[in-house]
């Protein structure tokens, strides 16, 4: 039997995205993550997490990125729990040592890793417009067909692989990869006043 040791409700969202995230532990101390639909409208969103797992696993199968195992459960999904140091924590250690060259190198490595798989030229699609609206972007931008826009530094745990611990916001259409990189850097800088000088 698994016992819930942490729970977070995301019920401030639109009804079709409302979920609960639980961390559970079994009697052996093994941990698991459950993402559960809070209503019938959000079941499609939960199903999308499983679909994202399949898409990302295929995309990153020959890379240094690992997509933790995901299985379907009643009204939700169960994800493999990964512990370790996040890329954010690693960047903080480098930043607090004031080794700015290494910090930039590590962020460039992140950009290279996420750019290396499935890259192609950007085109605005109907699906893109539905999510991001009408925007003018160059068709020379590098993009990918499968994109986790929440691939921020806090969502990557590094051990022998780069483990993506949250892929709830993955889309199966072209998105400029520079947007994902920009978003990750912005969230990292804005996440702590200590990082403001960046």
Pin down the residues of each PLM region.
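ATP-binding glycine-rich loop module of kinase domains
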Residues: 6, 12-58, 62-66, 87-91
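Short loop/turn segments at strand-loop or loop-helix junctions that form parts
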Residues: 36-37, 79-84, 166-169
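Structural motif
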Residues: 28, 73-74, 159
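A conserved mid-domain beta-alpha-beta active-site/ligand-binding segment of alpha/beta enzyme cores
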Residues: 198
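Catalytic activation segment of kinase domains across protein kinase-like and atypical kinase folds
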Residues: 130-195
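Hydrophobic residues embedded in beta-strands of well-ordered beta-sheets
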Residues: 32, 77, 162-163
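Conserved structural core of kinase catalytic domains
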Residues: 66-133
């Amino acid at each position: 039997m698994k016992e819930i040791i942490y729970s977070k409700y995301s019920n401030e969202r639109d009804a079709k995205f409302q979920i609960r995230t639980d961390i559970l532990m079994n009697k052996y101390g093994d941990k698991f993550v459950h993402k559960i639909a809070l209503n019938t409208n959000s079941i499609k969103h939960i199903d999308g997490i499983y679909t994202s797992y399949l898409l990302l696993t295929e995309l990153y199968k020959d890379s240094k990125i690992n997509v933790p195992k995901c299985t379907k459960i009643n009204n939700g999904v169960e994800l493999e729990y990964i512990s370790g140091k996040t890329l954010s924590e690693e960047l903080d250690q480098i930043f607090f040592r004031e080794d700015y060259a290494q910090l930039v190198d590590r962020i460039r490595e992140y950009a290279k890793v996420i750019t290396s798989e499935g890259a192609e030229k950007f085109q605005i699609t109907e699906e893109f417009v539905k999510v991001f609206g009408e925007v003018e972007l160059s068709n020379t931008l590098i993009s990918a067909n499968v994109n986790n826009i929440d691939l921020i530094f806090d969502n990557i745990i590094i051990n022998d692989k780069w483990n993506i611990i949250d892929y709830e916001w993955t889309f199966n259409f072209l998105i400029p990869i520079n947007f994902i990189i920009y978003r990750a850097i912005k969230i990292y800088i804005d996440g702590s006043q200590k990082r403001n000088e960046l």
